[in-house]
Amino acid sequence: MRLIYVSMEDCKRTVFPYIHKNLTSNEMAPVYETDTQGMSDLGKILQFVMNDDYYPTFSDKTSYLLCSLAGAQYFVNGNKRVGVVVILRFLEINNVHLSALTEQQFQTILSIAFPAHAWEHNRHIRNPHAAFLYNLAIVIGDKARWGTNDFSQLKERVAALFEHSYFVE
């Protein structure tokens, strides 16, 4: 399957507006486009994920995107939200099918991979998959919940979670 990648234009046209419209009721998001360094760093991530030598599988690519974006401080605020929405966009433009799991099943999967994390319910997130990504982004953003200090091991764990969650045609 030939993958379609999220571009900077996608971020400006789709990702950032989605965040501002739907994910700012509890905490404001910055105007991402005005952060020159953050936008530059985001662009590098979006380019590097295309490298099949480093990220040969869909799960590897998805893991790299989420871990790199949610686990960094490229922007003053909203890095986890950018990571989650970029992943959702990546899934959407590639017509990826999700495992039909309940929120409880996603909780169980996440607790096995990251036992130090207690599932956080967000009343604004009703979709089980979105709740899973939200909680996974929280784990990635907090090294104390990883169970390791090794970023490569974190990416491998996240890739394994994604292998069982997404079906690429």
Task: Please report, for each region that a protein language model flagged, where it lies by residue.
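FIC/Doc superfamily catalytic core
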Residues: 1-169
